[in-house]
């Protein structure tokens, strides 16, 4: 299994970096993991819809450079499908069994994802109807991927 996380923006807080390093280590027992950070665009105060669209398209261009053609793409979106941890584990396991051993998760920046990225998504995943900082979402996603592998392998952790 190969998992790639493409995320817009850099992690600046040490406590988040520490959690990312820890979960990356834990996941490495089960899967190859690549985390790719693409630069985010500086967002002006109160941007217009046109400005937002232009910023999102610039970020999308950066994301697309790293997207592999054969990868199953999962975007994190507020309007995506909410899953339980067990359902996410089943999704990852089912993809692996069906021969889709390369999964790419995409986390947008503060403005979200461009429509172009959303349209190429094979699965839109939502962690909540609430909005979270995109840097924190990386930690939450890594924790859920790790939890998924523990569930798939029947190992204790997910209770």
From Swiss-Prot:
Lineage top rank: taxon: Archaea
GO MF annotation, one: rRNA (pseudouridine-N3-)-methyltransferase activity
The protein's enzyme class: transferase
Reactions listed under catalytic activity: pseudouridine(1915) in 23S rRNA + S-adenosyl-L-methionine = N(3)-methylpseudouridine(1915) in 23S rRNA + S-adenosyl-L-homocysteine + H(+)
One GO CC term, this protein: cytoplasm
Localisation: Cytoplasm
Keyword vocabulary terms for this entry: Cytoplasm, Methyltransferase, rRNA processing, S-adenosyl-L-methionine, Transferase
Matching InterPro entries: Alpha/beta_knot_MTases (IPR029028), RlmH-like (IPR003742), tRNA_m1G_MTases_N (IPR029026)
EC number(s) given by UniProt: 2.1.1.177
CDD domains referenced in this protein's UniProt entry, alphabetically: RlmH-like
Protein purpose: Specifically methylates the pseudouridine at position 1915 (m3Psi1915) in 23S rRNA.
Cross-referenced HAMAP family: 23SrRNA_methyltr_H
Family statement drawn from the similarity comment of this UniProt entry: Belongs to the RNA methyltransferase RlmH family.
Protein name, UniProt field: Putative ribosomal RNA large subunit methyltransferase H
Organism expressing this protein natively: Methanococcus maripaludis (strain C6 / ATCC BAA-1332)
Gene: rlmH
């Amino acid at each position: 299994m190969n998992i790639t996380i493409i995320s817009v923006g850099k992690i600046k807080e040490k406590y988040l970096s520490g959690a990312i390093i820890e979960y990356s280590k834990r996941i490495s027992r089960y899967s190859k993991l690549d985390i790719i950070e693409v630069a985010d665009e500086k967002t002006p105060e109160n941007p217009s819809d046109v400005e937002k669209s232009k910023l999102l398209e610039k970020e999308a261009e950066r994301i697309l450079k790293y997207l592999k053609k054969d990868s199953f793409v999962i975007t994190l979106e507020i309007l995506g499908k909410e899953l339980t941890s067990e359902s996410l584990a089943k999704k990852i396991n089912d993809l692996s069994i069906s021969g889709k051993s390369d999964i790419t998760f995409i986390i947008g920046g503060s403005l979200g994802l461009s429509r172009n990225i959303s349209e190429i998504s094979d699965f839109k995943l939502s962690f909540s109807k609430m909005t979270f900082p995109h840097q924190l979402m990386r930690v939450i996603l890594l924790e859920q991927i790790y939890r998924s592998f523990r569930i798939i392998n029947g190992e204790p952790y997910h209770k």
